[in-house]
Amino acid sequence: MNKPVVRFAPSPTGYLHIGGARTALFNWLYAKKNGGTFLLRIEDTDVERSKAEYIDQITDALSWLGFDWDNNVVLQSKNKSRHKEVVNQMIEAGTAYRCFLSKEELDTLRQESEKKKELFRVPKTYRDYSLDQQQALIDEGKAFTVRLKIPDGITEFSDLVYGTIKVDNKELDDFIIARSDGSPTYNFVVAIDDSDMNISHIIRGDDHLANTPKQILVYKALGLAIPIFAHLPMILGADKKRLSKRHAATNVQEYKEKGFTPTAIINYLSLLGWNPDSDQEIFNINELISAFNFNQVQKKPATFDEKKLLWVSGQQMARMETSAAVKEVESLDSNWGMNQDSKYKNDVIALVKDRSKTLNDLIEISDVFFKKSISYDEEMSKKILDDSSIQIVADLHEALNIEENWRKDALESIFDNLMTQHELGLGKLIKPVRFALTGLGYGPGIFDMMILLGKDRCLNRLSDAAKL
């Protein structure tokens, strides 16, 4: 088998969204697994909506995710002369023709069909006009579009996800490949660009299934090799409607800002439509490349669940090497741990990363180890530090103040005595203590945390909390 050449071809009309990132991932995984080539083409022919800032954001997001594309980025807008050249070749060859039906004429015909409750079909009035007849109409100043001459028969293709798909060409109109202003249409330029880039496998969302027969007809009209297709299942929100901003953040940049790592995003996206032959859900990148197979990609729409993403992220956070986690946090927040000893920072991250789901969690929890004092949230203080809780904090301060051995066993003994004194279980005892020491309602094990904070810092914070 020849090594595959795949492409990711986003339109720069917005930020890279979750669906686009999943498409890029599956292309990238397939190329990596099979020693192939992963290309990036920006489909920027929509002049009004395409923006340079979106191109930059898309390429930055792909780089952040680690999807290293081969060769230079291809801008579709740079291929305009090539597209026009092929349109003219097809007119000369008789595989396409100029259609002089105006928009107004087509609208009238469409309305007549609607009145009769008939399916509207574009008339093939000019399909068999000779080049001379077409030129005569041009000389009269008639505007025209260019349409593909669709032959009789069946268009059939084999999809790696959907299997064999057949479309009767009678169901298709002679569709436009160039508009009246000369600009080529999507299904035409995609086929030309994919052929010119030697794309062997087209991997994209299943919303493009309906476009595929049209693109195959363009390939056939030009005598071009037809690539292999794989259409990925749609991503839905929890309400089973297409994923949108009302369900969750939809672009990759937002998840980066929320503190998700590339590995967590990639791991979760891989599970949206792909079902490995095992119960394994947590993968590193090399494991994903090795395991990925289109035989396991499902037709059924995938449901995006941000809670599941958080769970995957937490699992990845726990597996991350401490030194790597420190680097990730420092790259996200340059002020994090400033003027702190590197060993202490590593010790802090090693302690808190198993309880964190994102890098933002890591920053929030670890920050309490660097502060001299804690700013307590007023609302949380009222809920957690009632009179009995304040007494627990005060009693703990008194016991710690006279304890000379700052060791885990000594702390455990003090807490045992407090449990007896206040007739409480450890969980209820820890809640106000944790809040007093960190200002948070969650975090690492209380004894390990206190050891790392140090006696003086613990005493000062307990004293501050007891005064609330």
Over which residues does each language-model region extend?
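C-terminal accessory/binding modules appended to enzymatic or scaffolding proteins
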Residues: 386-437, 442
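Residue-level signal for inorganic ion chemistry
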Residues: 27, 58, 90, 94, ...
